[in-house]
Design a protein with these regions (language model features):
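Mid-to-C-terminal catalytic subdomains of enzymes
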Residues: 1-13, 20-132, 136-137, 141, ...
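Phosphate/ATP-binding catalytic cores across multiple sugar-kinase/actin-like superfamilies
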Residues: 146, 150, 154
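C-terminal non-catalytic accessory extensions
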Residues: 153-185
């Protein structure tokens, strides 16, 4: 949302993301954690907290300070909740917690699985949520193997809002966006 062209667009995108969150990161985290008999604690997922944050004037949430998540960081400035270098460190992509090497390895592996001709041919058979990279085709074929004909369960790809300047990318990772910092490299 750092790239939102207006407060209204920011709020609309935030509302859309919240409506769809259960289908992306929340579902993935729940499944990955539950399979190991663990339970996730998600303090920023508290419904009262989410309602509170969504009620804040979106104009205040725009990135006017050159630092993403400014209001959240500012809220933790007073007191000793977090060390200063942690509180103000560069922004990192949530999905990169698995490590850059694993993400890069999967992309490289997908490139070896399909020729460009095979990619074009195989992706064309999917009319809903059509794969747009060899990596996304690899994931789609794995999904279809275990859940054939169930693709309608997936609304769409979790991607930046491509209509916003700086967000027309073909990778769901925030690593490809200009506001992504050096954290985690």
């Amino acid at each position: 949302t750092d790239f939102a062209p207006s407060a209204k667009a920011f709020q609309e995108e935030a509302q859309k993301r919240i409506r769809e969150l259960h289908m992306y990161d929340v579902l993935r985290a729940d499944r990955c954690i539950s399979v190991n008999s663990l339970e996730a604690r998600v303090p920023f997922g508290d419904l009262d907290f989410v309602k509170y944050v969504m009620a804040i004037d979106p104009e205040m949430k725009l990135n006017k300070y050159g630092k993403g998540k400014y209001l959240l960081r500012h809220a933790f400035e007073k007191g000793d909740y977090l060390p200063h270098d942690i509180l103000w460190r560069e922004k990192a992509a949530f999905s990169d917690a698995v490590g850059h090497s694993m993400v890069d390895y999967l992309k490289e592996y997908a490139e070896t699985v399909y020729t460009q001709e095979e990619f074009e041919e195989k992706r064309a058979k999917y009319t809903h949520a059509q794969p747009f990279t060899k990596e996304s085709l690899l994931y789609r074929e794995i999904f279809e193997k275990y859940y054939p004909g169930q693709s309608q369960m997936i609304v769409d790809f979790w991607m930046p809002n491509k209509s916003w300047e700086g967000c027309n990318v073909n990778d769901p990772s925030a690593r490809v966006l200009a506001n992504y910092g050096d954290s985690g490299k």
